[in-house]
Design a protein with these regions (language model features):
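Intrinsic disorder at enzyme termini
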Residues: 1-18, 205-211, 215-217, 225, ...
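Cofactor-/ligand-binding subdomain signature composed of acidic, glycine-rich
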Residues: 1-50
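Gly-rich Lys/Arg/Thr-decorated short loops/hinges at beta-loop-alpha junctions or inter-strand turns
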Residues: 25-32, 85-97, 200-206, 247-252
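Ferredoxin-type iron-sulfur electron-transfer modules in oxidoreductases and energy-metabolism complexes
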Residues: 33-50, 79-81, 87, 96-101, ...
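Conserved phosphate/anionic-ligand binding catalytic regions in large, soluble enzymes, centered on
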Residues: 51-73, 172-184, 188-190, 343-355, ...
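Histidine-anchored nucleotide/phosphate-binding helix
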Residues: 104-118
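Short amphipathic, charge-patterned alpha-helical segments
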Residues: 111-115, 261-279
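Hydrophobic alpha-helical positions that pack around
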Residues: 136-262, 274
Length: 398
């Protein structure tokens, strides 16, 4: 049996020397899709329909169909519209978008241009996590190259089509990964989630219709437009088309980003990451980042890495951030660290989250220190139940 291998769609080849440059990207067909759209003035609905057929779903966590999300932009909306890339990757275990921006920034730019064209937006913003200084530098350099090559700006390729793109660095707040908190921060305000409705497609950045997508999602668009919807959907499995970048960390021998077909068995992904370190037994896995439920070893070893497969074992794909834990792991300590993260990162806008996350962390810390009581277990459930479903954003549910 052959060993599992990567299929790189959003990440460049391993042997690439300077993959972040325009010259390298053009050699691999980069901007061909954008130039074809500009030359032919492809109908916007055609691009959206192609993305719908491809089966591309949001790679940031929610898994919402990308083509459908783009179609929510009101066609009759007059005036300015925006496309926004959410590169505020801040959840524990996530680091895929960092490598896309570091090594393949032009594909994100082309993806934003195509998505912007599809919804009628002439301006885009990439909101990049503040701690990602090198990725931000790479993206800024790529923007300069694209402008100099006439791929961004006014009257592109002699047409009346315009598209300009800007980057904005975040300031370290995890909550700004929530799309409406991101918009608040982008506008220079305190990063706190907005009430919905109205949704961003109606009232978004600066009060204008806005569509927000994840970095990996937008980077997937150019290859789909270039190679066709059927090509992309044939890579993955039913209901989970294409490739997915899994950020594997924890107790493995080769942690890192692995871009593989959706639906790959977890045991194959674990093999690619070198297996559990020191030959120890697997205890549990967090398959999609700290906001998704933990899966025990026996269940995850029989699971496929896609939306449906992980749902069947009571968890979720999330952002594809796979945290592997071996038999030496104390699960109470894991819970303590995760609960502290959400306590520290609560924006404080909603009382159940602001107060409840603190209560959860303090009780778990007490249990971790050997000072807990049986009553604490009941209190934990009681507090958690009073947070869930009572907050503006999903942080409380996490």
């Amino acid at each position: 049996m052959s060993s599992p291998s990567e299929i790189r769609v959003c990440l460049p080849p391993h042997d690439a020397v300077t993959p972040w440059t325009l010259a390298f990207y053009r050699e691999r067909g980069g901007y061909d899709a954008w130039e074809k759209v500009l030359k032919n003035q492809t109908p916007r609905e055609e691009i959206i329909e192609t993305l719908k057929i491809s089966g591309l779903r949001g790679r940031g966590g929610a898994g919402f169909p990308t083509g459908l999300k783009l179609s929510f932009m009101p066609r009759d909306a007059q005036g300015q519209k925006y496309i926004v890339c959410n590169s505020d990757e801040s959840e524990p275990g996530t680091f895929k978008d960092r490598d896309i921006l570091r090594f393949n920034p032009h594909q994100v730019i082309e993806g934003m241009a195509l998505a912007g064209y599809a919804i009628g937006a002439t301006i885009g913003f990439n909101y990049i996590r503040g701690e990602y200084y090198e990725p931000w530098q790479r993206f800024e350099a790529a923007l300069i190259e694209a402008r100099q090559a006439g791929l961004l700006g006014e009257n592109l390729m002699g047409s009346e089509i315009a598209f300009e793109l800007h980057s904005q660095r975040g300031a370290g707040a995890y909550i700004c990964g929530e799309e409406t908190a991101l918009l608040e921060s982008l506008e220079g305000k305190k990063g706190q989630p907005r009430f919905k409705p109205p949704f961003p497609a109606q009232v978004g950045a600066f009060g204008k219709p806005t569509t927000i997508n994840n970095t990996e999602t937008l980077a997937s668009i150019p290859p789909i437009i270039r190679n066709g919807a059927e090509w992309f959907s044939s890579i993955g499995v039913e209901n989970s088309g294409g490739t997915k970048i899994y950020s594997v960390s924890g107790h493995v021998n080769r942690p890192g980003n692995y871009e593989v077909p959706m639906g790959m068995p977890f045991r194959d992904l674990l093999e690619m990451a070198g297996g559990v370190r020191d030959g120890r037994a697997l205890k549990a896995v967090i398959p999609g980042g700290s906001s998704v439920p933990v899966v025990p070893a026996d269940a995850i070893m029989e699971c496929t890495m896609d939306y449906d497969g992980l749902s069947q074992v009571g968890s979720a794909l999330g952002a594809g951030s796979v945290i592997v834990m071996d038999e030496t792991t104390c699960m109470v300590e894991v819970l303590e660290r995760i609960s502290y993260f959400y306590f520290a990162e609560s924006c404080g806008q909603c009382t159940p989250c602001r107060e409840g996350t603190g209560w959860l962390y303090r009780m778990i810390r007490r249990i971790r220190n050997g000072e807990g009581t049986h009553a604490d277990l009941d209190r934990l459930k009681s507090v958690a139940d009073r947070i869930e479903g009572r907050t503006i954003c999903a942080l409380g549910d996490a």
